[in-house]
Curated annotation (Swiss-Prot):
It catalyses: an alpha-L-fucoside + H2O = L-fucose + an alcohol. It is an enzyme of class 3 (hydrolase). GO terms for cellular component: extracellular region; lysosome. This is Alpha-L-fucosidase.
């Protein structure tokens, strides 16, 4: 026992400590779980879920610089004169919010991590923050700790890593507006609200993803980002497992932080040198729930599997967003997409989880084919079934030990080498309901170069 304690102490002594500089912070290795996970679920939920119209930027579009007339017209048609955005908060009731049910749906999606909005740009906190009096989910609205309840449900009933989105700025916070007017020479908002809430969140809920946003107006020095990250990596309760993104100040995107997001819906289509994430949303027009959305506004399963394949092939993670309702429901169309992704991953997860990019990301001869690799296997994710029943791949080079199979299909597949480079694979002869999945099919090749 004494020896184990000594070894533990010695290990702690030799853990690197990171200085509050980008040169130092950028040297921190990304915890391995994140790259292995590949797929996560984003959830945008807040007071904006009450009007659930336009997007989660409803308040800004109504009262901010955008001043969109369609929002004004919506308010005139549906709410009395003098109605304020703050009046939506008591309507954020979450009476149907069942964290155990959410955890089950999220687990069924095949995702390996979830990122919940703790606070969006409106400033309403989904936990009882002592720095957001009467503008939080315990003092107002649901009168529940929405963050804490989901954190517990996820950890006790799933194998997902729990993460939190946090907006550094608030559109209309007087301290923030004063600092902005002072051209960031004062930091009253950062000290009294932004940093205080971040430390509170990490210490209370131990998120393994800290997904920062709302940083773009001010430099990282205003946000004290490097000091916070040094604490997060050195001394926080999640210092060994936490991952962060690149939204820590103006000009930081795609340059500094943990993994890169670069922009919303970032999907470069080519291999990147740095670990990255494609954060995108099933509703093509909004991150929050919209009551006016039509079926055509939602990405279908062909779209989603394609985006997953493209993203993972090029070394990224996919963070796919849904928007719960004001009363705490995951509506059927979102649930259907999540469960369908899970069914696809049950069959084809070997081509996604813990994979590495191969020497080629997509095929040179057959469009709609994306590659991943793991150990001695190369996976070709085939988005479109070939009309002829034969699939010719231009990149793989066969060898005497080459074998070809389809994930979820018991029998090996027949194949022949193509002169020069490539192989032609005979796809299974079967009806659509006999195939292992509906949307995309994975060819596993061993012994190819």
């Amino acid at each position: 026992m004494g020896l184990l304690l000594l070894l533990s102490l010695l290990s702690a002594c030799f853990q690197p400590r990171y200085a509050p500089t980008w040169d130092s912070l950028d040297q921190r290795p990304l915890p391995s779980w994140y790259d292995e996970a590949k797929f996560g679920i984003f959830m945008h939920w807040g007071v904006f879920s009450v009007p659930s119209f336009g997007s989660e930027w409803f308040w800004w579009d109504w009262k901010g610089a955008h001043d969109q007339n369609f929002i004004k017209d919506f308010m005139k048609r549906n709410y009395p004169p003098g109605f304020r955005y703050a009046d939506f908060a008591p309507m954020f009731t979450a009476e149907w919010y069942n964290p155990l049910q959410w955890a089950e749906v999220l687990q069924a999606s095949g995702a390996k991590y979830v990122v919940l909005t703790s606070k969006h740009h409106e400033g309403f906190t989904n936990w009882p923050s002592k720095y957001s009096w009467n503008w939080n989910s315990v003092d107002n609205g649901p009168h529940r700790d929405l963050v804490g309840e989901l954190a517990m449900a996820i950890r006790n009933n799933s194998d997902l890593h729990f993460g939190l989105y946090y907006s550094l700025f608030e559109w209309f916070h007087p301290l923030y507006l004063k600092d902005k007017q002072n051209k960031w020479t004062t930091q009253d908002y950062t000290k009294d609200v932004g940093l205080a809430e971040l430390y509170e969140l990490v210490n209370a809920y131990h998120p393994e993803v800290v997904w920062s946003d709302g940083d773009w107006e001010a430099p990282y020095t205003y946000w004290n980002s490097t000091n916070f990250l040094a604490w997060l990596y050195n001394d926080s309760p999640v210092k060994d497992t936490v991952v962060t993104n690149d939204r820590w100040g103006s000009g930081m995107l795609c340059h500094h932080g943990g993994y890169y997001t670069c922009s919303d819906r970032y999907n470069p289509g080519v291999l990147q040198k740095h670990k990255w994430e494609n954060c995108m949303t099933i509703d093509k027009k909004s991150w929050g729930f919209r009551r006016e959305a039509t079926l055509a506004d939602y990405l279908d399963m062909d779209d989603l599997v394609k985006i997953l394949a493209e993203t993972v092939s090029c070394g990224g993670n996919l963070l796919m967003n849904i928007g719960p309702t004001h009363d705490g429901r995951i509506v059927p169309i979102f649930e259907e997409r999540l469960r369908s992704m899970g069914k696809w991953l049950q069959v084809n997860g070997d081509a996604i989880y813990a994979t590495k990019p191969w020497r080629a990301q997509n095929d040179t001869r057959e469009s709609g084919v994306w590659y991943t690799s793991k150990n001695d296997s190369v996976y070709a994710i085939v988005l479109d079934w070939p009309n002829s029943g034969q699939l010719t791949l231009g990149v793989p080079r066969s060898s005497p030990t080459t074998t070809v199979t389809m994930l979820g299909w018991a029998a090996p597949l027949k194949w022949v080498a193509v002169s020069g480079s490539g192989i032609t694979v005979q796809m299974p002869t079967a009806s659509s309901n006999q195939l292992p999945c509906q949307w995309a099919w994975v060819i596993r090749m061993k012994g190819v170069m």
